[in-house]
């Protein structure tokens, strides 16, 4: 299976990373466009990419960041001044193609019927920008911020991926967006009477230069080093690297 090849290709042997990579690679079998909300009802997140090289590696015009960690329930994780590629800032606006996949295994309890998933993890990648009053505020871009009212909980579940243990988002910024800097925000909530302390999760973010010209990978790696982030390359089996001629 494709999943087996991905899992066996990783030195870590972490099933959740392999699963997340598989979903992250999914493509629309109906066209080369992103999967719409309506299509998703019939084809889910699409078909996994059978090309192992494209699943495990990326070109210089793109960078993929994998966060495999855990979050304390009732709190949030935030990376301010997120290292968004500077070459994608042109004429005062941010551009780029963004794919984001979030996967976690929530505690399940059949005693609660349709509410059997007991935790929900949300993620937002967005920008800090000035509002009309000249105040700085955060605006989610992937996914786009939506002001859900409590009475529309069903709508949020159906269209906002709430309580879904796999969330997949895509956006191609064509017109550009204004913003001072980027921020990654993750939070975790539970249903009532769910006594859970921590929720492990895997988050994958890919940022591409749509033109394929800019060296996005090296630029983001440089930002990570400058800001003191601790990170490692994805550990791929040596035989896989040799197979595709990747050092």
Describe the predicted segments one by one.
Residues 23, 35-39, 117:
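Flexible domain-boundary/linker segments
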Residues 29-47, 231-238, 242-247:
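Activation corresponds to long, low-complexity, non-globular regions
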Residues 41-129:
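Secreted peptidase-domain scaffold signal
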Residues 1-32:
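Hydrolase catalytic cores
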Residues 107, 162-165, 208:
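Intrinsically disordered low-complexity regions specifically enriched for long asparagine
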Residues 134-179:
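Extended, solvent-exposed segments with strong compositional bias
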Residues 116-131, 173-247:
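C-terminal edge strands of extracellular/lumenal beta-sandwich accessory domains
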